[in-house]
């Protein structure tokens, strides 16, 4: 940390606080949505949070033409003001206004990540350090944010958690305003070329079995994430009034992810052992989460689920990085980002359409299909490695 330059420190501090607020407010928003007594509003919270991701791949065109630091600054200011404004909205009233404000906030937020990545690329020697520190800060921020939200709820009201998120955005904006980088506009590709890049990413996914499997993994996990998020308020009811349960379950995201990241090297890549762990954990943890009436069991199930999801996420990214040309990887991940946002939204809507048994049956079929496809791809990977070794001999 001491070796980081001032610009890197400001970016890291701002993002750590902002991420902490994000996971403090997520359960708070799910709690507020239950006051509308309509699960479509709960699903709507998840949908407006994820749908803007669909447009993120095409925003690089604008980001390259504007001052990236100012984009980050004003994005955080807008988000901070909106979340502070949400605290004045009466509970259970004006559902469309509630969702519209969230959509504007998360919609503006999709400009932030491309700008942040572009700023990080300007940090020169600090790039590796800040990426490593940011990865570590992510899981810690989730845990601290969820814990802070729980304390706010116990100490006063759920609105405090929402206000806390607004404050973290404004503090993040303060740190970002101190970043001193010379603005150099870049004449990047136009919108038509951006769509062409997107199509090239789709083509690579269709023709490369390894990349297709990575994509299959990512959209499957996104659907599962949407389902789990939508059930947070229901599962939380098994713990007293249920409100604090949302924060405990959000804590599980960070805790499970932390364990999952640590297990990646032990479970391995492109082997059937890791695949079996991922498949069994995904199905068993979701079954427990959806059907058990015991909150303690739900917490254990949530931790196991997020362990599996962290492992799957790392596996999918590495599969793309190892099996696709470097110049095409950005386009593949652009398609992935758009698909993930859409699939999280779809997964969150299932609770309003079919019951838990049908959702579980669908998940079993989907994960089983992923298991079979991955096993075939792993076999191809093993055969390819054996052929490569024989050539070198």
Curated annotation (Swiss-Prot):
The UniProt record lists the keyword Transmembrane: yes
Alphabetical list of InterPro entries matching this protein: Bacilysin_exporter_BacE_put, MFS, MFS_trans_sf
Annotated compartments: Cell membrane
CC terms in the record's Gene Ontology section: plasma membrane
A Pfam family hit: MFS_1
A GO term for molecular function: transmembrane transporter activity
Membrane topology qualifier: Multi-pass membrane protein
CDD domains: MFS_MefA_like (cd06173)
Predominant location category: membrane
Keywords, alphabetical: Cell membrane, Membrane, Transmembrane, Transmembrane helix, Transport
Transmembrane segments: 11-31, 43-63, 69-89, 92-112, 133-155, 160-177, 215-235, 244-264, 287-307, 353-373
Primary role: Part of the bacilysin biosynthesis operon. May be involved in self-resistance to bacilysin by permitting efflux of this antibiotic.
Family note: Belongs to the major facilitator superfamily.
Name of the molecule in the record: Putative bacilysin exporter BacE
């Amino acid at each position: 940390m001491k070796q980081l330059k001032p610009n890197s420190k400001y970016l890291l501090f701002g993002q750590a606080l902002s991420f902490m607020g994000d996971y403090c407010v997520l359960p708070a928003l799910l709690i507020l949505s239950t006051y509308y007594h309509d699960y479509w509003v709960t699903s709507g919270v998840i949908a407006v949070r994820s749908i803007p991701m669909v447009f993120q791949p095409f925003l690089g065109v604008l980001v390259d033409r504007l001052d990236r630091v100012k984009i980050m600054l004003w994005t955080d200011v807008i988000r901070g003001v909106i979340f502070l404004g949400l605290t004045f909205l009466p509970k259970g009233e004006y559902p469309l206004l509630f969702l519209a404000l969230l959509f504007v906030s998360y919609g503006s937020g999709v400009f932030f990540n491309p700008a942040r990545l572009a700023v990080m690329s300007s940090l020169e020697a600090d790039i590796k350090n800040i990426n490593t520190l940011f990865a570590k800060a992510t899981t810690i921020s989730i845990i601290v944010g969820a814990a802070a939200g729980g304390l706010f709820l116990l100490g006063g009201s759920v609105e405090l958690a929402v206000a806390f998120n607004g404050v973290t955005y404004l503090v993040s904006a303060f740190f970002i305003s101190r970043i001193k980088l010379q603005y150099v506009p870049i004449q990047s590709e136009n919108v038509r070329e951006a769509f062409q890049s997107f199509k090239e990413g789709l083509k690579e996914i269709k023709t490369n079995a390894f990349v297709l499997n990575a994509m299959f993994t990512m959209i499957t996990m996104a659907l599962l994430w949407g389902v789990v998020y939508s059930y947070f308020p229901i599962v939380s009811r098994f713990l007293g009034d249920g409100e604090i349960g949302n924060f405990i379950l959000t804590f599980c995201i960070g805790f499970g992810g932390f364990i999952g990241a640590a297990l990646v090297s032990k479970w391995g890549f492109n082997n059937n052992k890791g695949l079996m762990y991922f498949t069994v954990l995904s199905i068993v943890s979701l079954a427990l989460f959806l059907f058990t009436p015991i909150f303690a069991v739900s917490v254990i199930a949530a931790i196991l689920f997020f362990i599996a999801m962290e492992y799957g996420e790392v596996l999918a990214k590495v599969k793309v990085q190892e099996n696709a040309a470097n110049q095409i990887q950005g386009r593949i991940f652009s398609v992935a980002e758009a698909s993930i946002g859409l699939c999280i939204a779809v997964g969150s809507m299932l609770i309003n359409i079919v019951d838990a048994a049908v959702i579980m049956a669908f998940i079993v079929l989907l994960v089983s299909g992923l298991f079979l496809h991955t096993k075939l791809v792993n076999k191809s990977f093993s055969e390819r490695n054996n052929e490569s070794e024989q050539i070198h001999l």
